[in-house]
Amino acid sequence: MQNIRNIAIIAHVDHGKTTLVDKMLLAGNLFRNNQNSGELILDNNDLERERGITILSKNVSINYNGTKINIIDTPGHSDFGGEVERVLNMADGCILLVDAFEGPMPQTRFVLQKALEIGLKPIVVVNKVDKPNCRPEEVYEMVFDLMFSLNATEDQLDFPVIYGSAKNNWMSTDWQKPTDTITPLLDCIVENIPAPQQLEGTPQMFITSLDYSSYTGRIAVGRVHRGTLKEGMNVTLVKRNGDMFKTKIKELHVFEGLGRVKTTEVSSGDICALVGIDGFEIGDTVCDFENPEALPPIAIDEPTMSMLFTINDSPFFGKDGKFVTSRHIHDRLMKELDKNLALRVKKSEEDGKWIVSGRGVLHLSVLIETMRREGYELQVGQPQVIFKEIDGVKCEPIEELTINVPEEYSSKIIDMVTRRKGEMVKMENTGERINLEFDMPSRGIIGLRTNVLTASAGEAIMAHRFKEYQPFKGEIERRTNGSMIAMESGTAFAYAIDKLQDRGKFFIFPQDEVYAGQVVGEHSHDNDLVINVTKSKKLTNMRASGSDEKARLIPPVQFSLEEALEYIKEDEYVEVTPKAMRMRKVILDEIERKRANKS
């Protein structure tokens, strides 16, 4: 029986989690000496590399002095809370990675709390101690206080600490004495993290994630809880609702390095992948053929936000995308449900529309962005918060919001948040910056980020996570400015935009193709304004001497997908295609729009 350690890595965005795993892989001699592995081995989809966030959890394993260490990378952002909980169930211990300057951040707290509740043993790694003005000792104190406030047990509070710099490939027990390898960390893992318990008896395995291969179909991944699984064995699949299906394991794989290796049997405590089990879902149990016993299912966070997805019916329909029909979008959303636990999809009464609910704007925008890159065209409506009726009272989701700003901007920010029904819970000074904590309705957070950044000259750091449902807090003011809407379809000209600049801000560049009903800018007043941006200068006028002024254009405002989703009003859609992102009115025709407003 080989030695196994299952370990999850918890860290805030950008504290160097993925880099640390890269170095651990190198230390386990996964790559030949002449083979260049590239950076960020684990964040293997483009979106994750661009945003620097880990969305899906990955499994890799290294062999260190005869001990097999399974490393499980967890997503740090609470919008992917559904991911976090099932992943932690595969581990026996965790590494909490914190930045030696910033200390533990609110998002880390979310994952750490889940880990401590399950009873994982933590190891704290203070990373980036090579940065100037870092404060490792204070950070250590902060971590201790955080764990204490999360009700950690005495055993958990007695955690080992390792200092180092993952980027420069060293770890040490004392931050003033750099070493030249990261083996102190690996030794620490082997000594402090308990080996998984060997449970004898009938086999049980909990399915915590899945892989997909176009060749063999869906592959179940999970940790063997008890007993031994063998290739070709007959097993029972127990669903979350208690239904049972008899099935058979065709192939067994274990993780080795970055890939999977076929094997004949896997015993309890190791993490493996099963091929040939049909119709499983995440959270099901694979157990004995004769006397099946299911493991208790994990609770997954309920969705708090929903959006309308619909087929692209704009005049530019089908220009960029490969998949544009409702059948394509329907199949893609169904496929996403397999992997994405916290997602719900409901078909609307109207044809070609779906209500998609998730954990927050980030969760849903990552899905839209992924679909866009795969060549889908679709339109999305304004994000709506999901209300619940609890004991006859209408309730809405409340989030815990943390904003860290320089002192001089704090009053502006507090004013902005309280206007959106946020209640201040705590305020503390840390040097020249202030840490503000609020309880705030999710409705108020939609569209808040852009305003906070503008008010604080881009200095604010903002993070939020779902807390609970509370009674409805009343109306919240939304964007008050109207939109500027294109009058007819065609090419936008600098000449026309120049003449209209005093009406508001534009979102389009000259020479962009626009269509009637597209939102091309923000009006400076609260009503919508229909403008003609396709008007060009008449040629006969060209020769009048001295009257030819150059058009001086203010650069247009450009939106990211999240910003656009938070910006639009109820009667607007964001149109998303592989090459472009536009905002438009739901009803394109101006006269029809007026009619609808009157009724």
Predicted regions: what is each one?
Residues 582, 588-599:
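Acidic, low-complexity intrinsically disordered tails
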